[in-house]
């Protein structure tokens, strides 16, 4: 030990000498006192302090060597002491047994209260969880105490206690108990793990424990991703915040208040914005003083309540932050340097701890009582509430009836004997467990004091109450159920008051849908007796077919309608593609079947198509309708056009080859006459003779058309003109041209050929189409009422008038189809296609279409718990005919156990679906020694009085009292809380496991979105919460009004001008203000999350009515900024992470820097434009000078993503998100990017304007300043940090950059010499006149040329004659 401390001393003395010799820096010197001698156990915290002290006073080198020595020291002694960990070091405290025993007792008592219906399921759950949580806490204390007293040098304890490894929660799991676990949904399982890892877990505990472990792993994985993305967004929003100025000179500031008289580290590293004075007016610090820890402590000592400090939030530097507003760079506790990228540092500081924040905590269900103080009575006596006392009944989360104070008052306990009265201060919201005037003993819990009027934000949650036994439901009077209709018209039943719902035991039978009970209510039944009977009937009647049964049911099919096509034989034909079925008529016409036997078809579908070659063409061609032929107008021509009226169809054949090949492959010329079989294009041959037309585009052959017919060269211009274009039909015997007539119908067209113009007479084919298609003969079987079938034949033309069919192969012009028609069917009904043998000739098959009604009949079940045993009988045989409404099968439900049958009341809307049999074991008879004090119909629970001095041992409803015996029908009570949704009505029958009610309860919003990463994200993204709190818009006095329907409340705020602001409060919202309270704008009227946008609006609207626009905007923004910074800090603090305010302020500044222009006034701004507040301010100042109308605007809050996308730099925005949108908009608006931030410069590939690259940036700024050398004579700002630099950096001071070179670049000495020789007055002459104005320099000032100077320079040969 001695040697190392010596070496450390010598080193530190050297370092301090060195420090003394070094020049003292400009900032306040830190304390140079030697470290105080620490006579204590050095644990993690003390080590941290030691290292920090050394770093501050002696720099890095000394500190690192000291840390090294400390490490060696630690290892040396750890080795000698042999600190290791073994199983024997895990000592389980003796107290564990007792603690667990007490917890078990409490829980048993709670379970008993639940069984007796004194508390609801929710209250039971809450109590169990709170009991275990408390036991766990007490066990941790026992563990600490055990180690501290019995084994202070135990390795495990030393590690956890010194902070070297592990923490108390881990030690708790090793030697205390593992505690409660959450299931994957985040609800806590109310079965805790009672053992620890030393004792070992049971199998069940191990499985439950692995839930929690998995949750931890998944959470960590998600958290890293989320936190990384948060950091990326933060960096993007703040990357262009760089310290660019020394002092912006602002007078604006923020105020830091002392918390409990202490500032902690919140002032350290800031600069004061005004003098700080103590109560006597003595100045403690001037403006712009850096506050270091001693100064902060002296403020506390002087009792300063609040200090005004400069902050990045109020800095007026343009698009950056100045050194004095930012304060210390926390890395080395000195004023921040110019060119420091403080935005990036802020983003990393906030993003990095993100991984330490929990994603979501567990839903504890219920609120643990840690934050409230329990007060017990010190004396026995009488309780007296003060005169101002106002209380209301309240039921605690554990189901204890108490009272809640509505105002602050004093409670006194007057002692019954001698002694001093005990006074207790009761605050608003505290719970009282005693009544006014009650006599109490000493050490009784009197009250639970709430920590201030903290109304926590709560959320609605629900829990189902599941029935544990089958039986009949009975409500207690107290419940007072009422029907509530929601917007959709659904009716729900809700409990109005706290009360019990009973389930009286019995055997409940579920009846099938159409079953009728065959026994009356209140009749005795025996085992095996039929209780109810269900019958299944045929709807339409018909012929019965029994199918083979499948599974536990069998199908009865009834043929309702059948139709046979008796003229057609059904033939099967095999082809390579599968089976084809044909229908053949007597005359040999064939129809091809579109379906196969055994399949189903619907109405309007095609059954078969006529296979007819009469309407098949040889090639493609042109369709023309002769007059008289008409088709139905159809929406889609997919299936062709239905023929309305028969007639003649004319067909002009032509052959079309679709080619799409290069023109070089063409082997004929356009307009040429060719014979059949000519090769027109390589490997493509014409099938007919005729005239060729070639279509080509861009040297690609598209089509070749061959039009057949007779070709006549013609010179008659009139005739040629007549048949130009599409051509015309010519009837037989008509003259076409001189000496040319036709004897059959022709289609004539004018064509051009290599030989010259002529007429082409094309043949026309005629097809006759009948008016109607012939229908086959049918035989039909159908019922008197019910569905029936029909067949309809239709003719469909594939093409319409004047349609050109481009094809080489032939096409079918007309299709004749048979369609199925159905009448009076239901949508679910389908038609079955069957193959049926002919009645007379068995070898011939016919096509039959049938409609079947299918009835599923259940098989017998022996005894299924809820249906009893059933017995099913079929009442029909295969092949018989039944009428509509005949019974096909009957099912009987048999009684399982003898007893008394009871039926619930049936209504039209609600037929009997269940019945109950009260068995002997559902009742019990209790005998009493005295006369019973109970009456029939009364419901009692364990412990209620039966007779004098005798209590009941079970729960139920009294059915009979005779002499000294009481007959009780067993039952079970369930407590339901007000506003619960009741799933069953009074008298309903329930099976075990049915839901009885849905309890609606409030639980504290779990620390969840209220904490951790999701909350940080919600704040920084400025998200609008789903159901936000109601905010007060104008200041005033609160008045709470009841709504018209006694349900809703309204808060009225009487404002200063006697106007009344009305705020209706929705159901389920808690009001956070009380009658007569004074409220300010932006104050919360109800609980719930705050919408930050709405808050900003409230602040701004209120301030706008009293202050000028600019001030109102600045103040509203400042209020919101303060709120945001506090909220973000709260989340981090709750998780034990400390971040300096200034980092959050830098980010919040970026979020609140813009305003939205509402009315542009006379400025060039656009309404709706988002623009920096500073820009608007400058614009409006300019307007004020010129007398124009200023722009009106409202401040806006942008989330970090929005803010990143709305930066001035489009390069930065595009590299973040929505690249295309950002770039397109920037291009359309013609934006310029000034490359001010880091990202833009990195993307373009320039030096970044921070750190060492900052000076270059400064020079560019100076270039913008134009040709004024006097600006350059000051030392460039980037090097003002010279004196603050650490000794191990050296920087060469560069020469001041000149604006732009004089033409022949004379040196300063030359110029000076010239001046002296020519007696030029240096003050009058302007040498800058000889500098060329930069091309991009807009300051091309009018500069007077000094003639004398020019002459002198020319004589010296320093200036060319030009």
From Swiss-Prot:
Species, as recorded: Synechococcus sp. (strain CC9605)
Stored Gene3D superfamilies: 1.10.132.30, 1.10.150.390, 1.10.1790.20, 2.40.50.100, RNA polymerase Rpb1, domain 3 (1.10.274.100)
Cofactor note: Binds 1 Zn(2+) ion per subunit.
Name of this chain's protein: DNA-directed RNA polymerase subunit beta'
KW rRNA-binding (keyword) present: no
Catalytic activity entry: RNA(n) + a ribonucleoside 5'-triphosphate = RNA(n+1) + diphosphate
EC id: 2.7.7.6
Biased composition (Low complexity): 15-27
Essential cofactor(s): Zn(2+)
Role summary: DNA-dependent RNA polymerase catalyzes the transcription of DNA into RNA using the four ribonucleoside triphosphates as substrates.
């Amino acid at each position: 030990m001695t040697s190392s401390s010596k070496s450390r001393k010598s080193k530190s003395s050297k370092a301090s000498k060195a420090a003394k010799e070094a020049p003292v820096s400009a900032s306040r010197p830190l304390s140079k006192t030697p470290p105080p001698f620490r006579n204590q156990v050095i644990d993690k915290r003390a080590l941290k302090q030691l290292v920090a002290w050394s770093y501050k006073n002696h720099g890095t080198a000394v500190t690192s060597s000291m840390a090294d020595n400390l490490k060696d020291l630690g290892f040396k002694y750890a080795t000698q002491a042999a600190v290791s960990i073994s199983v024997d070091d895990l000592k389980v405290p003796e107290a564990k047994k007792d603690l667990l025993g007490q917890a078990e007792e409490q829980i048993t008592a709670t379970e008993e209260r639940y069984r007796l219906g004194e508390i609801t399921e929710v209250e039971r759950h809450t109590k169990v969880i709170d009991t275990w949580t408390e036991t766990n806490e007490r066990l941790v204390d026992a563990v600490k105490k055990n180690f501290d007293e019995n084994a202070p040098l135990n390795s495990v304890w030393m590690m956890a206690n010194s902070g070297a490894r592990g923490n108390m929660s881990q030690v708790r799991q090793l030697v205390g108990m593992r505690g409660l676990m959450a299931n994957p949904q985040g609800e806590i399982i109310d079965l805790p793990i009672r053992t620890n890892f030393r004792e070992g877990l049971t199998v069940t505990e191990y499985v439950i424990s692995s839930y929690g472990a998995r949750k931890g792993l998944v959470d960590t994985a998600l958290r890293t991703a989320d936190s990384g993305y948060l950091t990326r967004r933060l960096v993007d929003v703040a990357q262009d915040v760089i310290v660019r100025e020394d002092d912006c000179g602002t007078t604006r500031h923020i105020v830091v208040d002392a918390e409990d008289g202490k500032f902690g580290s919140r002032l350290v590293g800031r600069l004061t914005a005004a003098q700080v004075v103590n109560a006597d007016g003595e100045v403690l610090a001037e403006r712009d003083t850096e506050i270091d820890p001693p100064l902060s402590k002296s403020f506390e000592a002087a009792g300063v309540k609040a200090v005004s400090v400069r902050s990045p939030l109020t800095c007026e530097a343009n698009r950056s932050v100045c050194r004095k507003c930012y304060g210390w760079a926390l890395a080395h506790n000195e004023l921040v340097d110019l060119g420091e990228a403080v935005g990036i540092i802020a983003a990393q500081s906030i993003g990095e701890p993100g991984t330490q924040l929990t994603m979501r905590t567990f839903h504890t269900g219920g609120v643990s009582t840690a934050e409230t103080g329990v007060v017990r009575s010190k004396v026995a006596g009488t309780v007296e509430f003060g005169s101002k006392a106002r209380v209301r009944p309240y039921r605690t989360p554990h189901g204890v009836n108490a009272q809640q104070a509505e105002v602050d008052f004093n409670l006194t306990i007057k002692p019954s004997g001698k002694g001093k009265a005990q006074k207790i201060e009761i605050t608003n919201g505290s719970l009282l467990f005693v009544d006014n005037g009650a006599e109490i003993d000493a050490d009784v819990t009197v009250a639970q004091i709430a920590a201030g009027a903290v109304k926590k934000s709560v959320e609605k949650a629900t829990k189902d109450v599941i029935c544990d036994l089958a039986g009949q439901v009975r409500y207690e009077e107290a419940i007072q159920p009422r029907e509530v209709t929601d917007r959709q018209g659904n009716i729900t039943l809700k409990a109005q008051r706290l009360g019990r719902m009973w389930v009286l035991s019995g055997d409940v039978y579920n009846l099938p849908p159409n079953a009728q009970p065959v026994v009356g209510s209140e009749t005795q039944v025996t085992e095996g007796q039929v209780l109810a009977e269900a019958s299944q009937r045929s709807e339409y009647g018909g012929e019965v077919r029994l199918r083979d049964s499948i599974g536990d049911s069998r199908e009865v099919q009834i043929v309702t309608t059948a139709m046979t096509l008796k003229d057609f034989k059904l033939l099967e034909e095999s082809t390579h593609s599968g089976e084809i079925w044909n229908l053949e008529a007597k005359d040999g016409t064939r129809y091809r079947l579109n379906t196969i036997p055994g399949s189903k078809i619907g109405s309007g579908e095609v059954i078969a198509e006529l296979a007819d070659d009469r309407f098949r063409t040889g090639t493609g061609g042109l369709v023309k309708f002769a007059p008289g032929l008409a088709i139905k107008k159809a929406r889609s021509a997919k299936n062709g056009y239905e023929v309305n009226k028969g007639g003649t169809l004319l067909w002009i054949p032509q052959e079309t080859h679709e080619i799409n090949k290069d023109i070089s492959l063409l082997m004929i010329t356009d307009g040429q006459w060719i014979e059949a079989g000519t090769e027109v294009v390589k490997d493509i041959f014409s099938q007919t003779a005729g005239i060729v037309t070639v279509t080509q585009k861009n040297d690609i052959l598209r089509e070749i058309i061959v039009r057949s017919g007779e070709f006549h060269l013609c010179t008659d211009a009139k005739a040629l003109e007549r048949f130009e274009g599409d051509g015309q039909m010519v009837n037989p015997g008509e003259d076409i041209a001189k000496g040319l007539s036709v004897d059959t119908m022709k289609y004539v067209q004018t064509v051009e050929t290599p030989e010259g113009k002529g007429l082409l007479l094309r043949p026309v084919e005629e097809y006759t189409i009948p008016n109607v298609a012939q229908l086959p003969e049918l035989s039909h079987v159908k019922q008197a009422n019910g569905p029936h079938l029909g067949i309809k034949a239709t003719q469909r033309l594939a093409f319409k008038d004047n349609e050109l069919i481009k094809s080489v192969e032939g096409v079918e012009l007309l299709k004749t189809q048979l369609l199925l028609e159905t009448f009076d069917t239901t949508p679910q009904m389908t038609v079955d296609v069957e193959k049926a043998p002919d009645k007379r000739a068995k070898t011939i098959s016919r096509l039959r279409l049938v409609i079947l009604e299918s009835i599923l009949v259940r098989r017998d079940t022996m005894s299924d718990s809820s249906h009893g045993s059933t017995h099913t009988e079929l009442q029909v045989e295969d092949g018989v005919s039944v009428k509509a409404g005949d019974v096909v099968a009957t099912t009987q439900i048999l009684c399982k156990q003898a007893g008394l049958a009871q039926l619930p009341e049936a209504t039209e809307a609600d037929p009997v679906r269940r019945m109950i049999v009260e068995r002997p074991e559902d009742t019990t008879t209790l005998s009493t020694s005295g006369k019973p004090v109970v009456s029939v119909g009364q419901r009692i629970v364990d412990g209620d009085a039966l007779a004098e001095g005798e209590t009941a041992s079970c729960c139920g409803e009294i059915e009979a009292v005779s002499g000294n015996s009481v007959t009780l029908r067993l039952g079970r009570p369930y407590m339901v809380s007000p506003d619960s949704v009741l799933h069953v009505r009074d008298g309903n029958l329930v099976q075990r496991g049915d839901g009885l009610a849905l309890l609606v309860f409030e639980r504290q919003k779990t620390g969840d979105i209220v904490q951790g990463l999701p909350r940080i994200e919600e704040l920084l993204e400025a998200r609008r919460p789903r159901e936000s709190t109601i905010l007060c818009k104008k200041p005033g006095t609160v008045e709470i009004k009841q709504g018209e329907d006694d349900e809703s409340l309204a808060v009225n705020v009487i404002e200063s001008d006697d106007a009344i602001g009305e705020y209706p409060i929705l159901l389920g919202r808690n009001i956070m203000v009380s009658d007569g309270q004074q409220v300010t704008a932006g104050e919360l009227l109800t609980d719930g999350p705050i919408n930050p946008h709405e808050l900003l609006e409230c602040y701004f609207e209120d301030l706008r009515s009293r202050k000028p626009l600019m001030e109102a905007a600045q103040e509203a923004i400042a209020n919101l900024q303060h709120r945001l910074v506090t909220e973000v800090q709260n989340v981090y603090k709750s998780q034990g992470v400390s971040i300096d305010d200034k980092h959050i302020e830098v980010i919040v500044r970026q979020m609140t820097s813009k305003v939205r222009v509402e009315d542009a006034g006379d400025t060039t701004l656009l309404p709706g434009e988002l623009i920096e507040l500073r820009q608007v301010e400058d614009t409006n100042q300019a307007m004020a000078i010129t007398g124009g109308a200023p722009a009106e605007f409202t401040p806006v809050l942008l989330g970090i993503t929005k803010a990143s996308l709305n930066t001035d730099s489009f390069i930065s925005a595009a590299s973040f998100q929505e690249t295309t949108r950002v770039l397109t908009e920037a291009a359309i608006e013609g934006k310029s990017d000034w490359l001010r931030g880091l990202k833009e410069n990195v993307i373009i590939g320039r030096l970044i304007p921070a750190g060492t690259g900052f000076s270059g940036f400064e020079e560019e700024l100076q270039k913008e300043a134009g040709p004024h050398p006097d600006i350059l004579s000051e030392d460039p700002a980037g090097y003002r940090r010279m004196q603050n630099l650490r000794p191990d950096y050296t920087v060469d001071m560069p020469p001041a950059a000149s604006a732009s070179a004089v033409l022949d670049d004379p040196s300063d000495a030359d110029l000076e010499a010239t001046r002296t020789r020519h007696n030029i007055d240096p003050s009058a002459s302007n040498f800058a006149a000889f500098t060329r104005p930069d091309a991009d320099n807009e300051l091309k000032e009018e500069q007077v040329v000094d003639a004398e100077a020019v002459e002198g320079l020319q004589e010296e040969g320093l200036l060319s004659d030009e």
